[in-house]
């Protein structure tokens, strides 16, 4: 079954509908995945980077440097959509909020510092509300 998702940047931004996933999350790098159930992972030359629930990383005594909140952009974005990641990253960067983006088949997910999640949600809400209904992205997004 094909699930193409939205391609139009204006539609994507208007429909962001960010939601905070309950919990606290960390990113670790390990060469041993024994017993670990990552929520997301990337195999790199240096080891496997994994996103884990903080309590699971603590149980395995894994080192991490930051604790994140997980925000899901519930809009169904196409894997071929252009500009969504850039618009979101630019918005959060303008607010001084670090962001790590994970792209899923249906949705994009953001890891932001746990103590900045409210700021991130407010910035994303402003971004979504700033896109007029006539499909013209705000001037700040024209370069994307």
Predicted ranges, named:
Residues 53-57, 113-118:
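Helix N-cap motif at beta-to-alpha junctions
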Residues 37-38, 96-101:
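A short linear hydrophobic-aromatic micro-motif
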Residues 64, 117-136:
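Charge-rich, low-aromatic oligomerization/scaffolding segments with amphipathic character
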Residues 91-97, 123-127:
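Generic non-transmembrane alpha-helical segments
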Residues 1-91, 131, 138-144:
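Regulatory modules associated with amino-acid/nitrogen control
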Residues 105-107, 111, 116, 134-136:
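Structural preference for solvent-exposed beta-strand-turn elements
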Residues 69-71, 95-97, 108:
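Generic beta-strand structural signal
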Residues 29-31, 103, 114:
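Short, structured patches in soluble enzyme cores that scaffold and shape functional sites
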């Amino acid at each position: 079954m094909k699930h193409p998702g939205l391609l139009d940047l204006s539609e994507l931004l208007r429909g962001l509908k960010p939601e905070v996933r309950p919990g606290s999350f960390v990113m670790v790098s390990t060469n041993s995945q024994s017993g670990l159930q990552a929520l997301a992972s990337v195999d790199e030359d240096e080891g496997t980077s994994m996103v884990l629930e903080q309590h699971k990383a603590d149980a395995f005594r894994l080192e991490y440097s930051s604790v994140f909140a997980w925000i899901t952009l519930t809009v169904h974005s196409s894997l071929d959509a252009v500009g969504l990641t850039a618009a979101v990253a630019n918005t959060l960067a303008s607010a001084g909020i670090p962001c790590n983006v994970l792209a899923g088949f249906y949705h994009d997910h953001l890891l932001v510092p746990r103590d900045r999640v409210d700021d991130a949600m407010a910035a994303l809400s402003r971004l979504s509300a700033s896109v007029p209904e006539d499909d013209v992205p705000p001037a700040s997004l024209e370069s994307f």
